[in-house]
């Protein structure tokens, strides 16, 4: 994206009605420039109601991405794109993500990369950089762990957990 396109995107985002979210969290007002970061983490929130019964919905076009969490350096962002209220403009968010992910010099970190990459590809986003998957790496570090989910790993290795109150209020 050019700087003019980013400026227009910022204005579009500022014009969005965020809705009433009972939380300290609010969606970002701008899309960050992550060009200076070598490693970027991405986690998708999806609505995939038939996942347990039929497998990932991305291959059947059954379900959709509802939000995109991105972290780089000490910063993190969440971009709601298909919640009930408070969404950011979908097209510019996915255009930004497409531009970001086509950078072959970057490393992208996922948890359960196969699942998230399937959803990204279904949205037309191809990740061209190196891919690292914490779900694959975790048992290599400790094969005797009881749980390998992202929340357990983040708690044990980073001392942080999901903010359930914030997640519930953002999802409403």
Segments predicted by a language model, with ranges:
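Active-site-proximal helix-loop-helix substrate-binding element of RNase H-like nuclease domains
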Residues: 1-23, 63-66, 70-172
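DnaQ-like (DEDDh/DEDDy) 3′-5′ exonuclease domain used for proofreading
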Residues: 2-53
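Sparse, context-dependent recognition of short Cys/His-centered cofactor- or disulfide-binding micro-motifs
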Residues: 53-55, 105
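Short consensus segments that form the blades of beta-propeller domains
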Residues: 56-60
């Amino acid at each position: 994206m050019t700087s003019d396109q980013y400026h227009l995107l910022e204005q579009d985002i500022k014009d969005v009605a965020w809705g009433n979210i009972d939380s300290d969290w609010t969606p970002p007002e701008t899309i960050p420039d992550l060009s200076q970061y070598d490693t970027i983490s991405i986690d998708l929130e999806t609505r995939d109601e038939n996942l347990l019964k039929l497998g990932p919905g991305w291959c059947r076009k059954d379900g959709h991405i509802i939000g995109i969490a991105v972290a780089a350096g000490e910063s993190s962002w969440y971009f709601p794109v298909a919640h009930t209220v408070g969404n950011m403009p979908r097209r510019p968010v996915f255009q930004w993500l497409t531009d970001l992910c086509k950078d072959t010099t970057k490393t992208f970190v996922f948890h359960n990369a196969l699942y998230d990459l399937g959803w990204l590809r279904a949205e037309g986003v191809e990740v061209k950089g190196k891919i690292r998957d914490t779900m694959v790496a975790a048992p290599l570090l400790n094969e005797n762990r009881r749980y390998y989910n992202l929340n357990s790993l983040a708690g044990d290795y980073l001392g942080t957990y999901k903010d359930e109150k914030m997640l519930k209020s953002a999802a409403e």
